[in-house]
């Protein structure tokens, strides 16, 4: 009979929620105030997800362009969680701003109203990003993650679709907090979160005592896909195959070391599909099309993010201090620098 898995706790911000009043994290007791959706005129559909439909809209009281996320029938508890988290994070660095919570007067369907971001589809955008652009946007995303983690919240669905980028304005926002959750040490969480290609090994081996470091794996997957121009970087056909794809890069011996450390029992199905794989060098993924985006610092950062052992991954704050970001920090610390001009490289061209 397999024994219980070993306990684990976040290396940072572990006690944030226990130091706050219950009202901060007890989302089930939260009572959102719902305004009237009639103030918002839907303009066009932007997309749909598992839990919502998203529209561009106009606030007819002030002509402001907004995004309205109409929530599909889902447990009230989940809606309360998303609203409470968005309210707690309001005003945070690079976090999408919740403007209003409204209900359709007839159907009573709840909807969330957000600031509008003129996003470029990542499949097009990632093809044109320069080395500096990648460093810049990854740094901006880390600011958002360090902010939410410092507030005791794990995003749990970091992926390109949830990172809005207005490339003209060099503006990034982390969106879709529908899977986000409050971190409490030793709590066991649902592993059915995040999107397949961005799921950390802890989710794939059914280890429930995870923490903020889950988001750092997902960010590592994004970084890998950007610098190597391979989208997605780990391309599994299903959740089982996803771990196999990871093992083919990080190695099977290293995986077994991770499982042993945390007393994790692997699903027997893996016996048939995992095989034996050596750890690959990150340099193996460099080719003529991506060489200009890869540097020793990029590979070093990547190596410190894509670790099986969630406790070994860099935290968001540690990642921001990595040499890979020195050029960005240098630019952002320049007084009165026009970041948009600098980062587009126009100054160099003059």
Swiss-Prot record:
Transmembrane segments: none annotated. The modification N6-acetyllysine is found at residue 97. It catalyses: L-seryl-[protein] + ATP = O-phospho-L-seryl-[protein] + ADP + H(+); L-threonyl-[protein] + ATP = O-phospho-L-threonyl-[protein] + ADP + H(+). It comes from the Eukaryota. Its EC number is 2.7.11.1. Constitutively active protein kinase whose activity is not directly affected by phosphorylation. Seems to be regulated by level of expression and localization. Belongs to the protein kinase superfamily. Ser/Thr protein kinase family. CK2 subfamily. Heterotetramer composed of two catalytic subunits (alpha chain and/or alpha' chain) and two regulatory subunits (beta chains). The tetramer can exist as a combination of 2 alpha/2 beta, 2 alpha'/2 beta or 1 alpha/1 alpha'/2 beta subunits. Also part of a CK2-SPT16-SSRP1 complex composed of SSRP1, SUPT16H, CSNK2A1, CSNK2A2 and CSNK2B, which forms following UV irradiation. Interacts with RNPS1. Interacts with CSNK2A2IP (via C-terminus). Interacts with SIRT6; preventing CSNK2A2 localization to the nucleus. Interacts with HIRIP3. This is Casein kinase II subunit alpha'. It comes from Bos taurus (Bovine).
């Amino acid at each position: 009979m397999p024994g219980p898995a070993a306990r684990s706790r976040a290396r940072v911000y572990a006690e944030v929620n226990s130091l706050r009043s219950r009202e901060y994290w007890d989302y089930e007791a939260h009572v959102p105030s719902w305004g009237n959706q009639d103030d918002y005129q839907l303009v066009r559909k932007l997309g749909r997800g598992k839990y919502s439909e998203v529209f561009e809209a106009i606030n007819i009281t002030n002509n402001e362009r907004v995004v309205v996320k109409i929530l599909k029938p889902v447990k009230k508890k989940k809606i309360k969680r998303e609203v409470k988290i968005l309210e707690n994070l309001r005003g945070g660095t690079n976090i999408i701003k919740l403007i209003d919570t409204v209900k359709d007067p007839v159907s009573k369907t709840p909807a969330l109203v957000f600031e509008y971001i003129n996003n470029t589809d990542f499949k097009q955008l990632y093809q044109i990003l320069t080395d500096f652009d990648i460093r810049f946007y990854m740094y901006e995303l880390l600011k958002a993650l360090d902010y939410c983690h410092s507030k005791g919240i794990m995003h749990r669905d970091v992926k390109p679709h949830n990172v809005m980028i207005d490339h003209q304005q060099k503006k990034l926002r982390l969106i879709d907090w529908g899977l986000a959750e409050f971190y409490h040490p030793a709590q066991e969480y649902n592993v059915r979160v995040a999107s397949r290609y961005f799921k950390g090994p802890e989710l794939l081996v059914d280890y429930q005592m995870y923490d903020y470091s889950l988001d750092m794996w997902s960010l590592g997957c994004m970084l890998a896909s950007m610098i190597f121009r391979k989208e997605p970087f780990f391309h599994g056909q299903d959740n089982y195959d996803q771990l196999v794809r990871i093992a083919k890069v990080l190695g099977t011996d290293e995986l077994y070391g991770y499982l042993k450390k945390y007393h994790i029992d692997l699903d027997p199905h893996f016996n048939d599909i995992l095989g034996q794989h050596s750890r690959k060098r990150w340099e193996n993924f460099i080719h003529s099309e991506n060489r200009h985006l890869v540097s020793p610092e990029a590979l070093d950062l990547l190596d410190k993010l894509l670790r099986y052992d969630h406790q070994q991954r860099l935290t968001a704050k540690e990642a921001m201090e990595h040499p890979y970001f020195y050029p960005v920090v240098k630019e952002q610390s320049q007084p009165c620098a026009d970041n948009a001009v600098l980062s587009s490289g126009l100054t160099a061209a003059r």
